[in-house]
Amino acid sequence: MSLRIYNTLSRALEEFSPLEPGHVRMYVCGMTIYDLCHIGHARMMMAFDVVQRWLKARGLKVTYVRNITDIDDKIIGRALERGITIGALTDEMIAAMHADIGALGLEPPTLEPRATQYVPRMLALIGQLQAKGLAYRASNGDVNYAVRKFQGYGKLSGKSPDELRAGARVALADGKTDPLDFVLWKSAKPHEPPEAQWDSDYGRGRPGWHIECSAMSCATLGESFDIHGGGADLQFPHHENEIAQSEGVTGKPLARFWLHNGFVRVDNEKMSKSLGNFFTIRDVLAQYDAQTVRFFIVRAHYRSALNYSDAHLDDARQALKRLYTALSLVPPAPVAAIDWTEPHAARFQAAMDEDFGTPEAVAVLFDLAVEVNKSHSPQRAGLLKALGGCLGLLQGDPRAFLQAGAGTPDEADIQARIAARAAAKAQRDFAEADRIRNALLAQGIVLKDGATGTTWEAAQ
């Protein structure tokens, strides 16, 4: 059976085959690292973690690139606000991001380029766009992209420039000749530190956000590649602008397939700090183990909206316990390679081959768990574990998971909560720090603060 993927560009399911037989090249827009990663970032990273895992399960080589934006208005603002260098802030946030990724059990991307490493390539692209008449120097010193000069603008969002302009709110006082035009190179501002500036033919300045991804994707994957992914919020204008930049230079399709994961809402409301419903990955892992968080995310289809709530996480935990309970009954037999002709495996494959249909694939896991409960077959248990592994699930020790659910957190859970408590203390949120300490104490874990950090031990 062939793999079909929903392509945002065509707004249809299309049969997928890589440009280079046997090798998939995929680029996903990563984090702008001025703060800790939140549950929306976790959803995006988890979605493409599953995509990567499934492509590999089908025997394909995957070169997965997820970039890091380490220069941006928000990064500059946060560094100035905290009185530290941009480098100190980004190094801190990258380390925190990697810790969160590790705690979630995500497979790392093949490459993780940082925007500041590719500024010369960005300037080269801007020069090529200017030579083709697609970019112009503005009165304020910026270099902007002339949107109406690119014939294909709007094809990803499905709207013409006139339709898009009707909703544009950009004033022309910023040197743009059209509200839809966007900045490729930002001239240096008096308040910006020297480390946020590079020399160029246009004077000191820095790249715009959109040109960063065009440069990094081309440098790491080539002028055309198989899959470009990201959150639904990036479809317009970020991904639309990437297409205009890259295809404006090369004349070739930037990516054959465009994939966008759905939004995360919190108790059916948009997640925002002002509403008090903003949750970092560390906040979530302070309450729930990583396997529960993964199960909560992957049992929903990646394109659907995901509603975060304690009730839904609690339900995910109970559902996952059913799968681990089956695996605790009998040691799973090792599976060297999944036999995709086996009926359960065939159903699982059919589900995943239809636009990474994780809800239907998870349903197969539960059907298989019922069989394990009845038969106590090591072979059935082995298949359950192997299929779960395609989603990054069921690879932990079943008894440890079930015992942790009974009230004793495991090592990874404890360390995640310690990290969340440290972050709360750093932000002087001592009430939250105390809440985490007391929650662990209620589960029989005592935290001890020392000169070298926080350690823990079981309560006597």
UniProtKB/Swiss-Prot annotation:
Keyword DNA damage annotated: no
Subcellular location: Cytoplasm
Recorded superkingdom: Bacteria
GO molecular function: ATP binding; cysteine-tRNA ligase activity; zinc ion binding
Enzyme Commission code: 6.1.1.16
Essential cofactor(s): Zn(2+)
Entry-linked InterPro entries: Cys-tRNA-ligase, Cys-tRNA-synt_Ia_DALR, Cys-tRNA/MSH_ligase, Rossmann-like_a/b/a_fold, tRNA-synt_1_cat_dom, tRNAsynth_Ia_anticodon-bd
Motif placement: 'KMSKS' region: 270-274
One Pfam match: DALR_2
GO cellular component: cytosol
Residues annotated to bind Zn(2+): 29, 213, 238, 242
Record text on cofactor binding: Binds 1 zinc ion per subunit.
Name of protein: Cysteine--tRNA ligase
